[in-house]
Amino acid sequence: AYWKSFFVPGYAHVANRMKKHCKVITLIHNAIPHEPRFFDKPLASLLFKQCHGFIVMSDNVRYDLRKLYPGAKYIQNPHPLYNHFGSKINKNEACRKLGIHPSKKNLLFFGLIRDYKGLDLLIEAMGQLNEDYHLIIAGECYGSFEKYQTLIDASPAKKRIFVHCEYISDEEIPIYFSAADALVLPYRSATQSGVVSVAYNYDLPMLSTPVGDFKNSIEKPGTGIVVPEISATALAQGIEELFTPSQQATIPANISKEKAALSWETLTRKLLDFINSGFI
């Protein structure tokens, strides 16, 4: 699996040695990193030329791959469901463990905290929402959390924002996703997101900005809302809409339908057909 150029020297060496004996297929999460540097594209091209084929999981990554390596042979398949973290637990119990109130509308920001993920926008949006809305921030910070803490301290919603700025173990994941009522992805840029696949496993509605593959993975199947622009106001308005009766009435069934489509078996069949097709 490839997502950053740091891996290229090792991956390219292995691929170059292995391609004489077997087909080399690379799963690409990001062909170009979210925070690119001048050497990312040439290094990615170096690796891709050593491979027979590729798996991509979004239109954005497919586009980047074809720009970097026009002759690439690939299949495209959505990110399958992450269902290995354990089952959903009782919401009251999950909230008790996190010290939050189960009767509130609990929003979850989950995963590694990086600038491009727009947590600052979500913190600002919380100040525009009423006291029914609480925010859980769960994940390690890539760098200092100080700038986010400053925003939280200055926010009228500071008592409704609960910070768990730390590594979240696999065993803890069911607690956070079971306590939440919605996952929020306020990203400034994206391709696809593994967190979306986790949210599906826990039947969690989602709200995102209009970046990456979120229109295909959230808006198109009707499992949440993609707001029209990247701003705190758009996030706040979208969050309020997500909790309207009309949205709450339709989203659960749409999530169930999408979960059935996001199987690892589907990806396996596509991959085997790709290998056996003679195209690579």
Regions inferred by a protein language model and the residue ranges of each:
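Donor nucleotide-sugar binding/catalytic pocket of nucleotide-sugar-dependent glycosyltransferases
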Residues: 49-88
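Conserved donor-binding/catalytic core segment of Leloir-type glycosyltransferases
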Residues: 101-117, 123-127, 136
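Nucleotide-activated donor-binding/catalytic signature segment of Leloir-type glycosyltransferases, i.e.
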Residues: 148-174
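Glycosyltransferase donor-sugar binding loop
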Residues: 110, 134-149, 166
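Acidic donor-binding loop of glycosyltransferase active sites
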Residues: 175-192, 204
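Conserved acidic donor-binding segment of nucleotide-sugar-dependent glycosyltransferases
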Residues: 220-221, 225-232, 239-246
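A short helix/loop element that forms part of the nucleotide-sugar donor recognition site in Leloir-type
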Residues: 86-100
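A short, well-ordered alpha-helix in the C-terminal region of glycosyltransferases
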Residues: 96, 157, 247-261
